[in-house]
UniProtKB/Swiss-Prot annotation:
UniProt name for this protein: SPbeta prophage-derived DNA ligase-like protein LigB
InterPro entries xref list: ATP-dep_DNA_ligase, DNA_ligase_ATP-dep_cent
Keyword Transcription regulation attributed: no
Phylogenetic placement of the source organism: Bacteria, Bacillati, Bacillota, Bacilli, Bacillales
Active-site positions on this chain: K25
PROSITE patterns cross-referenced by the UniProt entry: DNA_LIGASE_A3
Molecular function terms, GO-annotated: ATP binding; DNA ligase (ATP) activity
GO BP of this protein: DNA recombination; DNA repair
Family listed: Belongs to the ATP-dependent DNA ligase family.
Swiss-Prot/TrEMBL keywords: ATP-binding, Ligase, Nucleotide-binding
């Protein structure tokens, strides 16, 4: 049984509030796990069934009529989630990466929806399931302490934190202001060296000329400014190449090949 997950709103700064539960944000793949008719099934947030991709979760001992929400990760040697590794595991049956299902919510119990119950009650239900499994980790969270948790995320080079209203219901298929995320962004100076003709993705490079990947996210006003500044050097069937323009971008770490992950425009350096 698939349940469309509750999604997060993004905010820029963490805060302390005892009316919220704070959790570390794990960089992985959102996964809904359900057990009905004594069959465990796994779904991505977009309702793609991926049960066969994670066979190690098939023996999880949970009552029939249960639906869990969580994130599948692969932990790197230092313990931090490795997004590239979990995607490699997701895409290839030959991958030997061990996964961990980090469970943070329960939506159905005994075949009945408990989505309307407050988060604190759902956390109690989650703990009562006693999910004792080598590939499962229950995220309990802590009351308040948003600032301290965000500093910990930065110290450990984690993706960020999630701050959830303690009395919030589980809002199925909705991006809610009751659940907030604060991303631990990195900031890097790069050059825009061109853009794609079809969907206007910007080509980025580092000052030494090596590729930094593509950037999709730039506010409309800044796109207008970009097009007024650009000086076209040459074109191909797919790309327009320009004289390099220096800018700052924010992003979620770098890939093993040095590319920026999900870069977005921050400011001009001209």
């Amino acid at each position: 049984m698939f349940v469309s997950p509750m999604l997060l709103h993004s905010i820029k700064e963490p805060f302390n509030d005892e009316n919220y539960i704070t959790e570390l944000k794990f960089d992985g793949i959102r996964l809904i796990l359900s057990k009905f008719d004594n069959q465990i099934k796994l779904y991505t947030r977009h309702n793609n069934e991926v049960t066969s991709k994670f066979p190690e979760l098939m023996d999880l001992d949970i009552p029939d009529g249960t639906v869990l929400d969580g994130e599948v990760i692969v932990a790197a040697s230092g313990g931090a989630p490795d997004f590239e590794a979990v995607m490699e595991r997701f895409m290839s049956k030959k991958s030997a990466h061990n996964i961990v299902y980090c469970v943070f919510d329960v939506i159905y119990k005994d075949g009945q929806s408990i989505a309307a119950k407050p988060l604190t009650e759902r956390k109690t239900v989650l703990n009562s399931l006693e999910l004792d499994h080598p590939n499962v980790f229950v995220i309990e969270g802590t009351q308040g302490n948003g600032l301290a948790y965000f500093n910990l995320a930065k110290e450990k080079n984690l993706e960020g934190i999630v701050i959830k209203k303690a009395n919030s219901p589980y809002e199925i298929n909705k991006r809610s202001h009751n659940w907030l995320k604060v991303i631990n962004y990195d900031y890097t100076e790069v050059l825009i060296t061109g853009y794609t003709k079809k969907d206007i993705k910007f080509l980025l490079s580092y000052p030494d000329g090596t590729s930094a990947g593509f950037m999709e996210f730039m506010p409309h006003a800044e796109r207008t400014k970009f097009h007024s500044m650009k000086q076209v050097k040459s074109e191909s069937d797919e790309y327009v190449f320009i004289e390099p323009i220096l800018c700052n971008v924010k992003h979620r770490f770098k890939t093993k090949h040095g590319k920026l992950r999900i870069p977005s425009f921050e400011s001009w350096r001209v």
